[in-house]
Amino acid sequence: IMMAYHRERGVETRLVRIFNTYGPRMRLDDGRVLPTFMKQALSDEPISIFGDGSQTRSFCFVDDLVEGIVRLLYSDEVQPVNLGNPQEITIGTFAEEVVALTNSSSTISYHPLPEDDPKVRCPDITRAFEVLGWTPSVEREDGLAMSLDYFIEEVGKLSGPRAPFRKSERPLGRMGSRGAVQRRAKLRQRARTKNPRI
């Protein structure tokens, strides 16, 4: 519909295809894999995997997505642009990363794979790089670390403080909590430097 308005009426439009995005403020009950895994891991419940865990997905941190959208808004590109992270990971490996990050005792629970579940889901971001100069910059390990405190707080609202999980034991990866905050600040500053109108 938007493209029709652009072609017929000259309306200025921008089209973005958003692929798997994650970060703080995700709803625990939205059905997506990260909040589901986080909720289960922080509650020491079995991690639910559908199929054998070999299917791949890719995850783009919200800060990267926002930067891509802003660049598109200030560009002259009218064709659809894919925004996502092309780095694939198997669901099984992703579950293991979440368990390790949360210091959880959760085990993996396998369930039948839905018939319509895709084996691979990964964006082609060639156009985003060519016309916007955009590629995601936040490593998955860092993005998960920057999201952890939020999920701990949200799960705590449901069941109270998680007794087995002590803050001093939290494995936040190479960034650490202070590094996570600093990285987010640098991402925002970089976006402003690349486009002063942000």
Residue ranges and their predicted role:
Residues M2, F37, A95:
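Aromatic/hydrophobic pocket-lining residues that form π-stacking "cages" and hydrophobic walls in ligand
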Residues N20, P24, A41-R190, R197-I198:
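C-terminal substrate-binding subdomain of Rossmann-fold SDR/epimerase-dehydratase oxidoreductases
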Residues R32-L34, V99-A100:
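Glycine-rich, phosphate-binding/catalytic loops in enzymes
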